[in-house]
Amino acid sequence: MNKKPLEQIKNVTNVTGYRQVSLWKREDLQHPQPDELAEEIPVALVYNGISHVVMMATPKDLEQFAVGFSLSEGIIEHRREIFGMDVVSVCNGLEVQIELSSRRFMGLKARRRALAGRTGCGVCGVEQLNDIGKPVQPLPFTQTFDLANLDHSLAHLNDFQPVGRLTGCTHAAAWVRTTGELAGGFEDVGRHVALDKLLGQRAEIGEDWQHGAALVSSRASYEMVQKAAMCGVEILFAVSAATTLAVEVAERCNLTLVGFCKPGRATVYTHPQRLIAG
């Protein structure tokens, strides 16, 4: 199979995350106009030579995505358990080739064997309903967050969506300091992928999870809550609503879940004791 380094790939627009196209506007169907579309391509995560999952994603920040996915899915517990990564072009997509520690790879293979022997229920690729909820250690209560500082974060979330500003087609995930300042953020066509990129970047730079919160531009699904909790995030802010299962998972793992985050507004679903009204 022909493979080449990511920086040599021509069909992902030098990893800008978007592609220029021609299209037609309603008021003028005779003359095409230039515009931009967000890139969405298959990205396979391959652990020690075995393909584990294929996700549709924006072809940017894929190493951070791989680290975040590995942590939030319980494949690893620490960044140091990944020994190396390469991003290569294959067929019509990309592979992130990840070298895992032997112990973690054995655990991943055991989990795959357990899933392969069951009758599938077809829920989002999970083999049985009981497998939807991953075991998450209850989070500690180590911090407080003044909601008066959230408005600043919301006003600047779009700063981390350059592709979104061009295309109107990406989700964002950013880290909010307790002061309300944003300390890094990522975008992707997939809301889960954007969050994984953020979680991966936090792990890459060795930052702790006890000083701040995650902010996402999307709704809060149970997967988003579970991913955040798996990495030790105590507070998750979402611009849109939360689902019932998200609230149940957040309650069970002691995560403070807040939805409908707009300037001057926030709806707290679980564990408000970490928050200061404002």
From Swiss-Prot:
Q: Which GO terms describe its molecular function?
A: sulfur carrier activity; sulfurtransferase activity
Amino-acid positions noted as binding Mo-bis(molybdopterin guanine dinucleotide) in the UniProt annotation, renumbered to this chain = F260, C261, K262, P263, G264, R265
Gene Ontology biological-process annotations: Mo-molybdopterin cofactor biosynthetic process
Q: Which UniProt keywords apply?
A: Cytoplasm, Molybdenum cofactor biosynthesis
| Location (main, coarse) | cytoplasm
| Pfam families, A to Z | FdhD-NarQ
Looking at the UniProt record for this protein, which Gene Ontology cellular component terms does it annotate, in alphabetical order?
Answer: cytoplasm
| Catalytic residues (UniProt) | C121 (cysteine persulfide intermediate)
Q: Does the keyword Nuclease apply?
A: no
Q: Does the keyword Disulfide bond apply?
A: no
What start-end ranges are recorded for coiled-coil regions in this protein? none
**InterPro entries according to UniProt:** Cytidine_deaminase-like, FdhD
Location of this chain's protein in the cell: Cytoplasm
As for family, the record states: Belongs to the FdhD family.
Q: What does this protein do?
A: Required for formate dehydrogenase (FDH) activity. Acts as a sulfur carrier protein that transfers sulfur from IscS to the molybdenum cofactor prior to its insertion into FDH.
Q: What is this protein called?
A: Sulfur carrier protein FdhD
This protein's species is Klebsiella pneumoniae (strain 342)
